[in-house]
Curated annotation (Swiss-Prot):
Protein name (record): Small ribosomal subunit protein uS7
HAMAP family tied to this protein: Ribosomal_uS7_B
Gene label: rpsG
Family stated for the protein in its record: Belongs to the universal ribosomal protein uS7 family.
MF terms in GO: rRNA binding; structural constituent of ribosome; tRNA binding
PROSITE patterns referenced in this protein's UniProt entry, alphabetically: RIBOSOMAL_S7
Amino acid sequence: MPRRGPVPKRDVLPDPIYGSKLVTKLINKTMVDGKKSLAEKICYRAFDIIREKTGRDPLEVFEEAMKNVMPVLEVRPRRVGGANYQVPVEVRPERRQSLAIRWIVNYARERNGRSMEEKLAAEIMDAANGVGGAVKKKEDTHKMAEANKAFAHYRW
């Protein structure tokens, strides 16, 4: 913890093509080894694939996917009298967004074959339709929170 007060939050700039901060965050999460231009290419090509396959605005599809993947609850471990309890807590809005993007990119990477653009496009389209690995991860997170509802009074 810093002694000189809170650390200021750095704001990301909206991306040049879609003018969305959400897309910039997706690009940053897709980036590996600081290769941002490659990450941008991957994301924009994925969005082109989404436009081709759905005939809808890719930003709209991506926002729909985000809505379907963002978790409302998660569990956090809390040590009480020598036992670790999984305590369900509400997820802050910024964390919801970052978790959703992280899950979409990670599950896109885990998909078989093809190029990263196609895998990312497929994962975003699946998430927008309420299926796919990222949506399953959200449902599992909610199930864990539901199963541990009894420990909700240990919240801090």
